[in-house]
């Protein structure tokens, strides 16, 4: 991800700083991928965009996030969008779409925000409830997308853990004023390291068969990290030896964010150690067999540590590269994705 900074003083949504980040310009990679795809004669490369947060001055906490600590019982937050800036934030998203279009890149899908339930203040986020996202789409983002001068992106609601999809679907799909703007829902896999929640997909599809379900993010997270503050870690487990080592990927040597936590509302029994190859294969196959129309890994390629990542949330990826030596490692999950993409 990258940041598009806008200043509150004199902010005008007619003026936009552009999408070229000096340190992390995505456009060359996207253009190269589009060129490759165009020569294949298959379906278009579809890009889904998801902002992690509004600019800080649009939020109640006036910051990117507040970390969890002993002072707040380790309950960090990303804050919420101030109601007076709902229209401004919606126009900010539209300007992003237009900026990419001016560069020759059509964004296929859009979510109102990444992970609206938050991440306990570990990095940038912004919270919505089903009700507040419903109102935001109904009165602000939806109408603006309807007015989009060319082909508008498909709007995907939610974009967080699968287990709570039903509540969001019932609230938003159940409101026809909002549902008219929506293509479907986006989900992630982080609420368990082995459960797929296919029963949730079945129930949502049974009630709302006209709406798509797309898995927009999953990865091996917290790779080689210590347990976070406020989490019990009696075994002191920490991954190691994943680069140029297929054995790591085929055996139960990976853990996720909730492997040993004792936070309220988190069942650590749903987060046992796992074999990355098996988790990927099972999750993709079961998801596609239960109405999920597409499955996207969070990363394409990372360095050998699992970064770069500005908050140290190192992750596994299909391709990992030692930037010092230039050694390229196609991990076993690369071949899982390759096989299931055929």
Label each residue range with its predicted role:
Residues 85-112, 116-226, 230-254:
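Active-site neighborhood of glycoside hydrolase catalytic domains
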Residues 38, 42-45, 153, 208-211, ...:
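A short helix->loop->beta-strand "cap" motif at the edges of active sites that frequently abuts
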Residues 2, 55-72, 116-122, 165-167, ...:
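Short acidic/His/Gly/Ser-rich catalytic and metal-binding motifs that mark active-site loops
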Residues 47-49, 109-112, 215, 295-297:
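A structural signal for short, well-ordered beta-strand segments and their strand-loop junctions
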Residues 25-28, 32, 84, 88-95, ...:
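Extracytoplasmic/secreted proteins, especially bacterial periplasmic and envelope-associated proteins
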Residues 51-56, 113, 161, 301:
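Short glycine-enriched loops at secondary-structure junctions
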Residues 215-339:
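Aromatic/acidic polysaccharide-binding cleft in carbohydrate-active enzymes
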């Amino acid at each position: 991800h990258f940041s598009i900074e806008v200043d509150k003083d004199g902010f005008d949504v007619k003026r936009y700083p552009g999408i070229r980040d000096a340190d992390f310009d995505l456009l060359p990679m996207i253009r190269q991928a589009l060129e490759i795809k165009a020569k294949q004669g298959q379906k278009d490369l579809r890009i889904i965009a998801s902002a992690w947060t509004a600019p800080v001055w649009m939020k109640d906490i006036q910051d990117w996030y507040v970390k969890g600590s002993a002072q707040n019982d380790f309950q960090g937050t990303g804050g919420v969008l101030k109601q007076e800036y709902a229209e401004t934030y919606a126009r900010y998203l539209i300007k992003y779409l237009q900026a990419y279009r001016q560069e020759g890149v059509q964004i296929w899908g859009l979510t109102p925000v990444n992970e609206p339930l938050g991440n306990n203040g570990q990095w940038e986020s912004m919270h919505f409830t089903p009700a507040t996202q419903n109102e935001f789409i109904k009165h602000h983002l939806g109408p603006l997308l309807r007015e989009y001068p060319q082909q508008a992106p498909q709007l995907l609601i939610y974009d967080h853990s699968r287990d709570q999809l039903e509540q969001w679907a019932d609230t938003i799909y159940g409101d026809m004023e909002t549902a008219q703007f929506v293509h479907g829902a986006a989900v992630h896999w982080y609420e368990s390291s082995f459960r797929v929640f296919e029963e949730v997909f079945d129930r949502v599809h049974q009630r709302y068969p006209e709406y798509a379900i797309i898995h927009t993010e999953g990865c091996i997270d917290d790779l080689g990290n210590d347990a976070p503050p406020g989490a019990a870690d009696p075994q002191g487990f920490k991954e190691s030896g994943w680069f140029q080592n297929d054995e790591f990927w085929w055996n139960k040597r990976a853990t996720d964010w909730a492997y040993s936590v004792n936070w309220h509302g988190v069942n650590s029994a749903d987060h046992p150690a796992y074999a990355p190859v098996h988790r990927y294969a099972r999750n993709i196959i079961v998801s596609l067999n239960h109405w999920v129309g597409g499955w996207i890994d969070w990363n394409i390629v990372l360095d050998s540590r699992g970064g770069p990542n500005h908050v140290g949330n190192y992750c596994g990826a299909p391709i990992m590269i030692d930037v010092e030596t230039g050694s390229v490692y196609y991990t076993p999950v690369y071949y899982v994705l390759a096989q299931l993409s055929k």
